[in-house]
Amino acid sequence: MIAFAEDTSGISVSFEFFPPKPEAQDSFWATIAKLETVNPSFVSVTYGAGGTTRDRTLDTVRRIVTETSLSPAAHLTCVGASRAEVNAVVQDFAAAGVRHIVALRGDPPGGVGTRFTPHPDGYRNAADLVRGIKELGDFDVSVSAYPERHPESVSIEEDLAFMADKAEHGASRAISQFFFHNPFFLRLRDRIAARGIDIELVPGILPITSFSRVSEFAAKCGAHVPPALATRFAGLDNEPETRNLVAAMVAAEQVDALRREGVKHFHFYTLNRADLVYAICRVLGLGAEKKAA
């Protein structure tokens, strides 16, 4: 039997969602209601490439503000947009009651691995975007982090230099890309501390709903998938109940191991599904109070 740590005091979580299409509205808000019982620190809503989901992102965070007890964080990218266009989105978020923005440069139009060229009148990079957001108001700003190096960086040192710039311009939190080998994250945490970068590093946790899809995405992002993980999911493509049990256990083990290393906050990539994430949070001792009330 796996022995999880008994002391889960001080643990907090947050969740990422993407804005639902019209036909998925009912299931999306049911997911929100389910995970609201866990009392997350915040919930973030993604912003499609090139601003393609701008209106849906805005509508979603507005409803979260007005219809739930949750604190929303709106994602924002600067790819393919002028400063004026990006600033207008920030002002729209503020008018909707959003005080937390996840500032991301965004992927180049050609996708991961292609060359990024800033808009001639736009923000140059994520650090520049952070500075612009902070100039527009007293926002809490989160940014991204890459335990295994950004696909476009030549080294971890270059990543750390970018991280230092983002922190210097006002970012308070760095949410990591998903990873499956904890030492990558812990080494990044140590390097950030050694450089004296004043920013909270939060692990991004991705429960595996489909191992094949996660493997494909990991390959594009440069995220390592341990062979032992492949073994645990082998042959489960057509056994969803068993696959979900394994997925919940794998993610709970990862979170528990990080908690034993002093990590207190966990950010879950939900893929707009409540089942696995809710189960993991209950393993962590979260949500019981509201459920019993």
PLM regions with names:
Residues M1-F18, P22-Q25, R131, A288-A293:
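N-terminal amphipathic alpha-helix/helix-capping segment at the start of soluble metabolic enzymes
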Residues I2-F4, A24-D26, G51-I64, S82-A88, ...:
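Active-site-adjacent beta->alpha loops and helix N-cap segments on the catalytic face
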Residues A3, P120-Y146, E158, G196-A248, ...:
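Active-site pocket-lining/capping segments in soluble small-molecule metabolic enzymes
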Residues D7-S12, N39-F42, T68-P72, G97-H100, ...:
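Short, well-ordered coil/turn segments that N-cap beta-strands
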Residues S12-F28, P72-A84, D140-E158, A234-M249:
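Active-site mouth loops of central-metabolism enzymes
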Residues E16, V43, F93, K166, ...:
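Conserved, mostly hydrophobic/aromatic
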Residues F17-P20, T46-G50, H75-A81, L104-D107, ...:
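Active-site beta-loop-alpha junctions enriched in small/polar residues
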